[in-house]
Amino acid sequence: MPPKRDGEVLVLGIESTAHTFGVGIVSTRPPIVRADVRRRWTPREGGILPREVAEFFSLHAGEAVAEALGEAGVSIADVDAVAVALGPGMGPALRVGATVARALSAKYGKPLVPVNHAVAHVEAARFTTGLRDPVALYVAGGNTTVVSFVAGRYRTFGETLDIALGNLLDTFAREAGIAPPYVAGGLHAVDRCAEGGGFVEGIPYVVKGQDVSFSGILTAALRLLKRGARLSDVCYTLREVAFSSVVEVTERCLAHTGKRQATLTGGVAANRVLNEKMSLMAGLHGAVYRPVDVRLSGDNGVMIALTGLAAYLHGVIIDPGEAYIRQRWRIDEVDIPWYPWLPGDPPPG
């Protein structure tokens, strides 16, 4: 990587909201992404255990930061600001990232930039696709929401009323005995199992206004298995019903807002079938569809650094002593003063 140049701004971002401790470093000059280091906690069985995740993060945080600086070819002295995801997410995991960020900020005198994890996923999509004003479907293990920018913030136009889409897929796969691993060769266990399957009666399609619900789908799918339904049929139907419901509420948001751009972001954004459905829907409305770069679909420090860079350039900083975690920090509670700025645009002012 080239050494830091005059007028260049470098931001280090820290992600620690769930299973991944990520450190990213980005620049205002090409190449924009200078480092992308990740340490992922993987359960031996079952789901995420917050305390074990926090212990894992504590062990690997220091080496991850050092590796990112080495990958970028810079020192901490070259970094202009430190950005950190303060929520939403799991408390024990968030505290590790916040502690590391506060320490770096205080020890080295670096401005601290607070970042909302959900905002960062949407901005990762905008920044990697070049879409300035899209409707965004954000689907992950802990989040399912449809948002678009209106009057200074991302507004929620639809969301899950219970569990998230990623949680539905992972929980079903685990209970059905086809995971872990949840993802292999770029395919989720449900997708692999769905090959050769067909529709089976008994799984509800639940869209309530602009919102979706998945807990009933999960219960019905597991019940069908217990009654002897073919596993491939249940996987296929569960996937088709769930994906179609989130695409429908995204379509309603496009129609309501009149916007002509759509994107898909979050961990489930890497799913080929969901991308095909989103692309078809957008095409029917004459909208441009581009999903987030698959390399930034899952949790990562780069998206925190990118969002932190945008926020920092527009004056969003806090005192390290005010860097409190917010486990339930909603995306529509965050002001976005940089919108519709994209990397490569002239700096503000």
Swiss-Prot record:
Keywords: Acyltransferase, Cytoplasm, Iron, Metal-binding, Transferase, tRNA processing. Transmembrane segments: none annotated. It is an enzyme of class 2 (transferase). Its EC number is 2.3.1.234. Pfam families: TsaD. The keyword Acyltransferase applies. It is found in: Cytoplasm. Its main location: cytoplasm. GO terms for molecular function: iron ion binding; N(6)-L-threonylcarbamoyladenine synthase activity. Binds 1 Fe(2+) ion per subunit. Required for the formation of a threonylcarbamoyl group on adenosine at position 37 (t(6)A37) in tRNAs that read codons beginning with adenine. Is probably involved in the transfer of the threonylcarbamoyl moiety of threonylcarbamoyl-AMP (TC-AMP) to the N6 group of A37. Belongs to the KAE1 / TsaD family. This is tRNA N6-adenosine threonylcarbamoyltransferase. It comes from Aeropyrum pernix (strain ATCC 700893 / DSM 11879 / JCM 9820 / NBRC 100138 / K1). The lineage of its organism: Archaea, Thermoproteota, Thermoprotei, Desulfurococcales, Desulfurococcaceae.
